[in-house]
Amino acid sequence: MIGIDIVKIDRVTSAKSKFKSKFIYKFLLSSEVALVKNDASLAGIWAAKEAASKALGCGIGAELSFLDIEIYKDKKGAPKLKFNENIVKKFNIKNTSLSITHDGGFAIAAVIVEN
């Protein structure tokens, strides 16, 4: 399955300003906080998690939370994602691929989940 999401970076900036750290910890794991260099990278992580939820066909909600998905970087700095063990079993996930890009004030992510 494929999931794609686009987020306006200014929208993330506004939410961060309004809700402060509550906003960040609503969807970031502690391991992901270090990845946030600016609002564009924060928006990229948000888009990646939304795209991952769409690739599973369930969205963020009762079956899957933002905190069930971890975004990290490999040795070359490329973004990767993994789901927690319960989600891997529930959706029979075998492999994942992630791409994040930024352009024109937007963060865009595409995720492929193989079962």
Curated annotation (Swiss-Prot):
Catalytic activity, EC: 2.7.8.7
What GO CC annotations are associated with the protein? cytoplasm
Q: Which GO terms describe its molecular function?
A: holo-[acyl-carrier-protein] synthase activity; magnesium ion binding
Recorded catalytic reaction(s): these are: apo-[ACP] + CoA = holo-[ACP] + adenosine 3',5'-bisphosphate + H(+)
What is the protein named? Holo-[acyl-carrier-protein] synthase
Q: Does the keyword Transferase apply?
A: yes
Where Mg(2+) binds, per the record, is at 5, 50
Recorded hits in InterPro entries, A to Z, give: 4-PPantetheinyl_Trfase_dom (IPR008278), 4-PPantetheinyl_Trfase_dom_sf (IPR037143), ACPS (IPR002582), Ppantetheine-prot_Trfase_dom (IPR004568)
- Among its keywords, does the record have RNA-binding? no
Which metal ions or organic cofactors does this protein require, according to UniProt? Mg(2+)
Q: What family is reported? A: Belongs to the P-Pant transferase superfamily. AcpS family.
**Any GO BP annotation:** fatty acid biosynthetic process
Keywords (alphabetical) are:
Cytoplasm, Fatty acid biosynthesis, Fatty acid metabolism, Lipid biosynthesis, Lipid metabolism, Magnesium, Metal-binding, Transferase
Q: Which gene encodes it?
A: acpS
Q: Where in the cell is it found?
A: Cytoplasm
Where does the protein principally reside?
cytoplasm
